[in-house]
């Protein structure tokens, strides 16, 4: 269990850079982690780059402010909260309207399922929120909490509530839920994209939870080092 109030500024910066780089890279963004650091922490554009890719990364600066403020206020997940996350992360980075649920049906390339139709998105997400809250309330261990968060992430990506940006929103909700529960955040590295996508595509909850626990172990070590540094 972690103390959110005790996390160092350096750790928050590190988390922001890694979330921005890995989550956007999983979706195909070509900027390096060094490029991401330059944009977010150093405040300069290190080279010529695609404008959309730059906005995808820069949006994480606003998102980290949003995340910290929401944690401080104790904000619970809600439909409006999810739309706000999308609005922040997808500003100037998608063709659709950031912060608005999809209005036409969409498909996931290569998937063997059909996402929730637009007219059912709000209902399905409301049930998703209720189920997540119930599972977390019933959790008797940290592993139970992580299983609930992973289970609901798989389900969120199958609802696919937005026209674009579903993956980065879903992964941001993983981090927020972990921090809400005082658990080490889970940052999925782009190097493990195939493994991660396989867990989603096959709905392999057991494998996904084991993977998440591996990532938490790595995060725990990063937290320890940043605390020692501070």
PLM regions: where:
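FIC/Doc superfamily catalytic core
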Residues: 1-230
